[in-house]
Amino acid sequence: MTPIAVTPVAPVDIIYDLKHTERATESSPVTLLDVFSRAVSQYPNHELSFITSSAHDSTIHTKTFAEFNQDVHALAQAMRAWGKPTGSVIVVYLTEHEDNMAAVWASLLAGYVPCLQPALSAQQAHKEGHVGHIKNLFSSATWLTNESGAEQVQSISGLDIHLLSELKASAEAGVDFQAHQPNSDDEAILFLTSGSTGFSKAVVHTHRTILAACHAKGESYGLTSESKIMNWVGFDHVAGSLEMHIAPLLYGASQLHVHASAILSDPLRFLHLIEEKSIQLAFAPNFLLAKLTRDLEKRSDLFGKFDLSSIKRINSGGEAVVSSTAQAFARTLKNLAKDGDASFVISAGFGMTETCAGCIYDPINVLETPPSYEFLELGTPVAGCEMRVVNPEDGVTPRPDGESGELQVRGPMVFVRYYNNPEATSSSFVEGGWYRTGDVGIVEQGKMRLSGRIKDTVIVHGVSYGIPELETYLQTVEGVTHSFLAAAPYRAPGQETEGFVVFYSPTFDLDSEDAPAKLFATHRALRDVSVKLITLPPQQIIPIPINQMEKTTLGKLSRARLVNLFKQGELAKHIDRAEELVSIARGASFVAPSTETEKTLAGIYAGIFNLSVGDMSASENFFELGGTSIDVIRLKREGESAFDLPEIPTIQILKHPVISSLAKYVDSLISKDASQEEYDPIVPLQLTGNKTPIFMVHPGVGEVLIFVNLAKYFQNERPFYALRARGFEPGHPFFTTMDEMVSSYAAAIKRTQAHGPYAIAGYSYGGVVAFEVAKRLEAMGDEVKFTGLINIPPHIADRMHEIDWTGGMLNLSYFLGLVSKQDANDLAPSMRPLTRKEQLEIVWKLSPPERLVELQLTPEKLDHWVDIAGSLIECGKTYEPASSVSVLDVFYAIPLRGSKEDWLNNQLKPWAGYSRAEPSYTDVPGQHYTLMDFDHVPGFQKIFRSRLEARGL
């Protein structure tokens, strides 16, 4: 077989030739600003549309190219006033697509070089180290961010921080502005690598490399000015900014950019948006294809309901695409489509930050052309790109066709260098300009597929995590022998996404009497650390006696050797022994599901968590298995379908998370013998761990589902109880006074935990209730070591008097994600003269249908919920704080109104008068309604836990 390097069929020079041209022509823009100018000139009314990260604002905000052009020119003029030299690097750290997009184009127009900063780590030391590294790398530190971003980096000295809100306020529309005129080889945009194996590197892309990539992508996708694309990848990622924004802009295509949380929290919305906006090109990584398929393949009620005729191609990247997943997804789309003969093209692809995202694609109809391998082939290079597979030892000797080796690429879309890092740049290329991707691939009959990676990373849902960092944390687990632990990426045959395996030597004898208990505790701790660090537990944990764990001459464990032993079955005896010991440890608590209801629920639990039904004990706890608020909704729906019940109330799932307990409740519904339960405000969201329990009081809407995602982070550490308002269940009256509510909650807490010390917290309105409960417990002679107040001032009566029924209904609707923040603010005056029924009808029509389904809402339930929230408002109208507790911990986020500084100094710091010790005031990421949402809860839980530890809990 002959060694090969694959090149595109089309000659490169007819795609892009800029070597002798420094200014744009009508047909060949030379710089990104030429692309922008031409798009605005030729297609002024084409649209850029956006859906933000807010769970409470699901509306689509749209600007024409012409309107967006006016905005960014005004911003560029305001940026010029900073007086920075041309070519200065501006670190852009923003959340929303529109803000990022505007900041990048304004920077380019002003003559600056934008560097897109991904979300910073919630770990203070890691964050400070990264920001300090970036400051040194660029020899300056100009940041353009929002209030939340500024708060995150305020502890790092020497940064020149500019707020986007202030920049917008100083921008003047219509001002005569002379845009910067760059050359094609000037630095255009910098992208930061994941830093998975150390500090991030800054990838330099010039106008030339980006345009070469975008021309080639556009040809591959078949883009035209009539195309419509949808993107939900973050703008700090090359796929979001270059592949799904600048490439379509080059052709004048309209675009819809959706914040990832809007899709991840409701995958069905992916299809609704394709239908609503007639999307032709979209992006969906393998894990989303799998999630959509799981959620929708059995939804026969939706079959034939979607007009998906517009979609021409769905790109998938970031991780390998499982062939069976792609086929199942395509079949599901076919079932959902109104046109039963519809066909769907799924294009797996390969790309990196260094290659301007995708540079190798294989668009195929997976139903008409069944894939030949377990994972979809990645195909052939785009125009201008070449690929080859070589011997990884020398990096230059080509491998024969069909043999694996190191994948290398070259072409005009490959980056030019790492910023201020010539050593890393040099080591990334070999003779001939070939870039070393770090991946292991196979080229066969002109098509490429991946078979592994040389680099020490694991990819979870398209995000790369460093194995060395993961190992560092896993090494700290009790029961692990220091320096005798290794983690390695691994994907089992047929598995949808990549996972990892942990190999370690235990500190205890596996033949000792207490080995089962110790091994069970060690493996549980290893899983907990993994979930908290990278959101994924290990696929397999393999204990290997220390005398059988070989190290290299340099004293290191070889991950490659361990994985090979695992694949070859050489570690089977260790796996079997571990399973035997774990089985012994679980033996006392394992109870096989016995009733038909228990068996059915065991099957549902197993399906949600991808576990074996045979491993499901009747004592399994939904939340200890990792259940999230989204999983609760799935359990509710599947349970109602399996048992043919009109409703299983969400609160009953929260109160009965154990299979056997939930089965008894379901049986009572089936037999119609569900007698009215006595009201108990306590909702146990997780019960494991020996540390002091947390009692978390509901916000002003009365419900506690918002705490589900937070509670799971305390598994095996401390129990987590939520307190839910009275009135949701039939026959339960509303609270009428604050004293009545506090008495009920204090008594319930005492029933659950007889003696202190106590840890109590409350979110928003729940904060003042938590304060009063803490006072009551102290009056009973108990110690309250932690009282957490989350974004609530001590004086709330004036605000309570401002809220009438209409305002309360709109606030609740905004909190539930039924209406946008703007609608919640603007609709009240026109709605107040209407009847309650008419007002509810308006909100109902504005509400996203998928959100109503997710919440299982009816107009009657919403009406009742408004009354519950209203009863809590009434309780707060006469509330005035008095007396004090031993100590307070105040957490503050971006407020609903005003600045964060004013909120802290003038609204929250008066809590000092109600604390016998100096309160702590801790900044948390996010806004008032989003600080515990999908994006912010990982950071919030770390901050919250640190305050518990500071109080000795």
Swiss-Prot record:
GO terms for biological process: biosynthetic process. The keyword Calcium does not apply. Optimum pH is 7.6. Optimum temperature is 20 degrees Celsius. SMART domains: PKS_TE. Residues 592-670 form the Carrier domain. Residues 38-460 are annotated as: Adenylation (A) domain. Keywords: Phosphopantetheine, Phosphoprotein, Transferase. It is an enzyme of class 2 (transferase). This is Atromentin synthetase invA2. It comes from Paxillus involutus. The gene is invA2.
